[in-house]
Every structure is written in structure tokens, then in C-alpha cells.
Amino acid sequence: VGSEMCIRDRLMINLFLFGFLGVTVWAIQMIWIPFFAAGIINGVGHSVGYRNFESPDASRNIFPLGLLIGGEELHNNHHTYPNSAKLSRKAYEFDIGWFWIKLFCFMGMASVVSQGPVVQRNQKKKPLDSDNVWALLNDRFNVMATYSEEVIGPIVKAEYIKADKQGRRLLKKARKLLAVDEILLDRGKRLKISRILEMNAKIKIIYDLRLELEEVWKQRGNDVTEVLTSLKAWVEKAESKQERALDEFVQSLSTYYMPEPNKS
């Protein structure tokens, strides 16, 4: 009933503002989001653009400025955090839908229920505990994106510099390939990854560790103490590799924590 009233009220407002032309304006408003979001985004948004997060689907951000379709241009962000009212995730991204939501909040006409994972960082070093586990599970997609950027990226770059011509050809664009969710790997990509891992032992180590960390997150339905035990075992294994990029990533894991709930 509420949505029907909204649609009817919008028609009346358009008729008041634009006269008979308001019917055309209203019709465009009614089909704009369903047509572009459901029709265009679910097609183009799975084949063209870039990915911030390795969600287990082929979703992509078509363009960093979400201006025309309520921010749905940031489709990969939306698929990764489907309950979030805010679709922009990077400093260079803009979500027009979030802009209007914040404006309505400022005017006291709306309130935000969710805008993504509720996680904070504390740079003071401390041992891993269950609070870290909850925070890491909550923000696991961003954690894995960080692993790709700060571990896989630098190591692949260093190995590329040391490689011969054939090795460089194989390692070109390897950083993105080595971060892709296994569900999305076709036969050709799997073969290329196998060749990379056979050629370079160091890259094989960080790739295997990435897969093992993904397995830790898959235990999120288990008791938190079990997940903590698995995470500590992964950390111990990663530290044993004595790789600087890995060490820095491992140290960052204990900085994630869940904020205290707002009791006001």
C-alpha cells in the first residue's frame, strides 16, 4: 500500500509541476531504475569494468562514478556488500544514491540502517583473539583485497623484474589472475596459474596461502574458537616463510576489531 501511494503521489506531483507532460516524466521515472539496473547492469555489470573485491560471481564496477542508475554502476561493490546502502568503497568512487540518502538524513527524512561491514582498526599490536576473528570475518572481502594488493602484488612485481623474457610474459597481469575466486577460473586461466606456480616457488607459496586463508573464512559457521585456532595456524605458517610483505599483512590482522555497540 505504501509503495502504491508513493507511485501515485509522484504522478500527482509530476502532473502539478509539468502538466500533461508530467505523465511522460513519471513514466520515465518508473522504468528508469528497473530497466537500467535489472536489464543493463545485470548484463554489462558482469562483463565490463573493474573489480574491487573477489566476490564469488562475475560482478564488476562499470564506472567509478555512479551517477545515472542510483549508484548501481558500482555493481561489484553492491554484490560484495548487498545489505549496504552505500555502494562507493574507494576514495575515487561516487554513489549518487548515497549522496541523496545522506542529504535526506541531514534533513531528518531518513536514517541509515547499514553501510557495509562495521569494522574498525587499532594499530596497537596485540595477540589475535575472538574479537579480531569476528571483525576479520565481517570484513573478509576487504581483507582479501588487501592481501592481493599488499602481498601478491609486490611479490609478483619483484619476481617479474627478476624473470627472463618468457617468465615476464607469463607473469604479465598475474597479480589480478592470482586473486580471482576459484569459482570464476575457466580451464585456460587454471592452466596459466599452474604454469606460473610451477615456474616460481615464491609465488606458489603466497598463492597457496591465499587459498588457505579463504578456507579459514569458510569456517565462519563454526564456533569462533575453532576459527581462531585455524587463523593462528595460518599466521604461524605465514610467518615461517620470512617474507616481508607477508609479515606486514599478518601483523595487520590483529588491528581489526568490532566497535562497541551504540547504547544511546
Regions found by a protein language model. Name each.
Residues H78-P82, L209:
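Short acidic (Asp/Glu) and glycine-rich catalytic loops that position anionic groups and cofactors
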Residues G2, N83-S84, D223:
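Short, solvent-exposed coil/turn linker segments
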